[in-house]
């Protein structure tokens, strides 16, 4: 018997987590909370409009830890980070809500969204429609669907639920087979290419460049993971990739927003934004 990969462990734990949450809060209660939530802020629209101007459309990630790197940021205040990202030029936010592997929390999403005007994606491992409704109830504007976690029937089901509750969908792929499945199953304009292999956690920007020619022009490619310096950004922009999801490079910086500005908008001069506003 083979040893489960990190992704397989995460997905198995996610099914257990959803079962426990259903006992605490019914789907009907979540649906009521979703209907009462603030209106979605237009996650896909914000990215598409920014990328259409050939400007970096940055999804800035709020992530305390990861399975491969451990704690990324000890001084972790989601509201402060969200404000810093907004000042630094982010188009959208991504907030990790997975507890066991990324030290995330639902509250982090709520705190980040309340602190700024940016659209927010719930970054988690979605395996059940319950989680989609839960995301809208938390105030999320978009959800992530990871193709390697889902079969085509479940992927389509989750996307349909997302549409019903007013959420955009970012579908994430890592290889050609996953890309083909995503394009054939979903009509979302947002296609994320994860440069990190979720089974081994190895990273290569070639993943985006290899898959790029196979993606129709009407879809927006979001390159995810491995963007660490200006050379990485310029490599993508030369290939007409303008949407980015970046977390680690920002989380390790003293000021996440200043690092965002330095990496993506150097023409604005010396960054003045900070992680926490001085008194």
UniProtKB/Swiss-Prot annotation:
One of the record's GO molecular function terms: indole-3-glycerol-phosphate synthase activity
Pathway assignment: Amino-acid biosynthesis; L-tryptophan biosynthesis; L-tryptophan from chorismate: step 4/5
EC number annotated for this UniProt entry: 4.1.1.48
InterPro entries: Aldolase_TIM (IPR013785), Indole-3-glycerol_P_synth (IPR045186), Indole-3-glycerol_P_synth_dom (IPR013798), Indole-3-GlycerolPSynthase_CS (IPR001468), RibuloseP-bd_barrel (IPR011060)
Transmembrane intervals: none
SUPFAM superfamilies: Ribulose-phoshate binding barrel
Coiled-coil regions listed in the entry: none
Gene3D superfamilies: Aldolase class I (3.20.20.70)
Keywords assigned by UniProt, alphabetized: Amino-acid biosynthesis, Aromatic amino acid biosynthesis, Decarboxylase, Lyase, Tryptophan biosynthesis
A Gene Ontology biological process term: L-tryptophan biosynthetic process
A Pfam family hit: IGPS
Family annotation (HAMAP family): IGPS_B (MF_00134_B)
NCBIfam families given in the database record: PRK00278.1-2 (NF001370), PRK00278.1-6 (NF001373), PRK00278.2-4 (NF001377)
Stated family: Belongs to the TrpC family.
Record-given protein name: Indole-3-glycerol phosphate synthase
Organism whose genome encodes this protein: Ectopseudomonas mendocina (strain ymp)
């Amino acid at each position: 018997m083979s040893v489960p990969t990190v992704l397989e462990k995460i997905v198995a734990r996610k099914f257990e987590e959803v079962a426990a949450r259903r006992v605490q809060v019914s789907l009907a209660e979540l649906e009521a909370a979703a209907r009462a939530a603030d209106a979605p802020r237009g996650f896909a629209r914000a990215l598409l409009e920014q990328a259409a101007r050939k400007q970096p459309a940055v999804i800035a990630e709020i992530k305390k830890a990861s399975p491969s790197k451990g704690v990324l940021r000890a001084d972790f205040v989601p509201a402060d980070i969200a404000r810093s990202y907004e000042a630094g030029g982010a188009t959208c936010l991504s907030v990790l809500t997975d507890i066991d592997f990324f030290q995330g929390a639902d509250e982090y999403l709520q705190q980040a969204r309340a602190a700024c005007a940016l659209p927010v994606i719930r970054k988690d491992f979605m395996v059940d429609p319950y989680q989609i409704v839960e995301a809208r109830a938390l105030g999320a504007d978009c959800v992530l669907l990871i193709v390697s976690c889902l079969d085509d029937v479940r992927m389509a089901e989750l996307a349909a639920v997302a549409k019903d509750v007013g959420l955009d969908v970012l579908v994430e792929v890592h290889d050609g087979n996953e890309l083909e499945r995503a394009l054939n199953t979903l009509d979302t304009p947002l296609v994320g290419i994860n440069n990190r292999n979720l089974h081994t956690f190895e990273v290569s920007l070639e993943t985006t460049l290899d898959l790029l020619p196979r993606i129709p022009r009407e879809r927006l490619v979001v390159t995810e993971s491995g963007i660490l310096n200006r050379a990485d950004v310029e490599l993508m922009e030369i290939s007409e990739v303008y949407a980015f999801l970046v977390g680690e490079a920002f989380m390790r910086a003293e000021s996440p927003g200043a690092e965002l500005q330095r990496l993506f908008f150097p023409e604005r001069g010396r960054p003045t934004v900070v992680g926490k506003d001085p008194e």
